[in-house]
Amino acid sequence: MLDNFNQPKGSTIGVLKDGRTIQEAFDSLPRLESFSGSTATDKLRAAITLGVSEVAIGPVEGNGGRPYEFGDVVIPYPLRIVGCGSQGINVTKGTVLKRSAGASFMFHFTGEGQAQRPMGGGLFNINLNGDTATALGDIIKVTQWSYFKANNCAFQNMAGWGIRLKDVMESNISGNLFRRLGGPSGGGILFDDVRSAVTDNVNNLHIEDNTFALMSGPWIGSTANSNPDLIWIVRNKFEFDGTPAAPNTVDSYVLDFQQLSRAFIQDNGFTHFTTERNRYVGVLRVGATAVGTIKFEDNLLFACESAGLIAGGIVVSRGNVNNQGSATTAIKQFTNTSSKLCKLERVINVQSNGNVSVGQQILPDGYINMAELPGNTRLPSEYDADGETTSVLRVPANTQVRQWSVPKMYKDGLTVTKVTVRAKGAAAGAILSLQSGSTVLSTKSIDAGVWKNYVFYVKANQLQETLQLRNTGTADVLADGMVFGKVDYIDWDFAIAPGTLAAGAKYTTPNQSYLDVAGMRVQAVSIPMFDGPTTGLQVWVEATSANGSFVVVMKNDTGSELVTTVTRCRVRAFVS
């Protein structure tokens, strides 16, 4: 019935399609007091026995000014419980419910034991409270259910959980208040263990446009056997504005997921979470057994101490902003120990005066994180403080690093390309080989314990559909990222030893073959450059074969002996 409002978005006054006002619609619902029973719990159970689809609960004035008390009410079908709203946070007016003393929960929407899964139902326009501020258990439980909704409600005043979800799908929790909840054994919303199989989980759940405040424990969290999947946590407010009756006894995180997969945590506001404020050491923690992709994007982490800890999962973090006073007091970036690919961009720090004190990370043009490339072997990703984007691949000996497709534009028979790889050896004996199919094009010995750039050139006639890098050595390689692209020139640097030249004498450098590097694509060469003075010498480049090689000639054109000190020569070979 309440889905049929003909009401413009944002309006507080509306009518049904049949012309009735909202108040008339509410008054036409079956009222709690119309059912038999001596207590509110008894009356609601009587309504459930009759199978009514909706029950309206009026303001506390109809109950002598006291909250309606409910305890351990099991709801086995899609019942809608509708209130008339409430006034104020610590309410005394409106539809106010309270869990009965000694109860484990207030309401349990459960499809267990049903021939068919319940679809629909939920809570609307109600203020729901625990029996005491230190009571444990749950206010609401939902099990084996689809299309559950909790809209425009408040969940408050208990050390247990506001909402516990188990095997709940296609559901929505939006426009609610979660406040004065949680403790060492509680929190706001919990994704509980799977019911029987891993697919009996919480999935396709939207938690949107809610306000969370004054809580302990995880404000949203999951257990180690929960497997939540396809979760939206969007446009919520998470604000620390005090500690509830049951404070945290261990370091805690606002969003704390032991397991999570395919999640969108976006456009939320987090405020004032620090160790000094109820031991909130970070905003987000993802456990080591998390497996799927989690996007943490475009959130405002104002006056927060730390972004959090990523121990598992494939986490993408970008567009997040902090507002600390300076770079030295800016938010601590994510700690990443996940063995899976994570791409964690810096949380930007913008001071109150508008100055950016911690900005975006600048990456080289065309830079690709190695872990983002495809491959034929699952490789562990690990944290390295000196990694370009913190996640690097550990590649065992005799294993493919990654492979990539060559752009068709480069396969014109004319283009020479360059691969620059940032890598380090875990120990001596690491070797990187660039291959086209099974053909080895070039190899590089990788120094142990130090990050360096290693450059490979690929001739035009070597560019096949794909290229690959392999560790062909005997030690692990840590591979960070690479840049692959067309080159216009190659700087050719080599050792020379002209020594002392008599008057009129010439020195010819060792032969330099560019055939294996650039093929026959060299169009021109530059004037040779040296690492010392060449006063009195004539220098030039001579081609030495039709297959692509050259020497540099140095001639003493003076009338006396010349002592040279140069030891290296560089020639730029233009290939485009």
Curated annotation (Swiss-Prot):
Entry's Gene Ontology BP terms: adhesion receptor-mediated virion attachment to host cell; symbiont entry into host cell via disruption of host cell envelope; symbiont entry into host cell via disruption of host cell glycocalyx
GO CC aspect terms: virus tail
Keywords of this entry: Degradation of host capsule during virus entry, Degradation of host cell envelope components during virus entry, Host-virus interaction, Viral attachment to host adhesion receptor, Viral attachment to host cell, Viral tail protein, Virion, Virus entry into host cell
Alphabetical list of Gene3D superfamilies matching this protein: Single-stranded right-handed beta-helix, Pectin lyase-like
Carbohydrate binding: annotated span: 380-487
Annotated catalytic residues: 170, 229, 239, 241
InterPro entries, alphabetized: Pectin_lyas_fold, Pectin_lyase_fold/virulence
Subcellular location: Virion
Domain notes: Consists in a catalytic region, a carbohydrate binding region and a lectin-like region. The active site consists of catalytic dyads Asp-Glu located at the interface between 2 adjacent subunits. The lectin-like region is probably involved in trimerization.
Family: In the N-terminal section; belongs to the Przondovirus depolymerase 2 family.
Subunit-structure text: Homotrimer. The 3 parallel chains are tightly packed together to form an elongated structure of approximately 7 x 12 nm. Interacts (via N-terminus) with depolymerase 1 (via N-terminus); this interaction probably gives rise to a branched tailspike.
Name of this protein: Depolymerase 2, capsule K21-specific
Organism, as annotated: Klebsiella phage KP32 (Bacteriophage KP32)
